[in-house]
Amino acid sequence: MRKTIKVTLIRSRIGRLPKHKATLDGLGLRRINRHVELNNTPAIRGMLNLVSYMIKVELLEEGNQCV
């Protein structure tokens, strides 16, 4: 069963390092309290690890898609 990850931006991008802002852009997170669903891959996990202090991560099963 393939898992997806629900990622929510909980802290502002203002005053962050340009590398962290670029990582958030790559993840598709542009506004606070917005979320995206991403595939659970090592590349995505590395990006999430870089900006872990700004986001909330939840694992979703294949049938549990968020609305």
UniProtKB/Swiss-Prot annotation:
GO cellular component: cytosolic large ribosomal subunit
CDD domains in UniProt: Ribosomal_L30 (cd01658)
Gene this protein is translated from: rpmD
Subunit structure comment from the entry: Part of the 50S ribosomal subunit.
SUPFAM superfamilies the record matches: Ribosomal protein L30p/L7e
Descriptive protein name: Large ribosomal subunit protein uL30
InterPro entries from the UniProt entry: Ribo_uL30_ferredoxin-like_sf (IPR036919), Ribosomal_uL30_bac-type (IPR005996), Ribosomal_uL30_ferredoxin-like (IPR016082)
Keywords: Ribonucleoprotein, Ribosomal protein
Top-rank taxon, per record: Bacteria
Family as reported in the entry's similarity comment: Belongs to the universal ribosomal protein uL30 family.
Gene Ontology BP annotations: translation
Molecular function as annotated in GO: structural constituent of ribosome
HAMAP family in the record: Ribosomal_uL30_B (MF_01371_B)
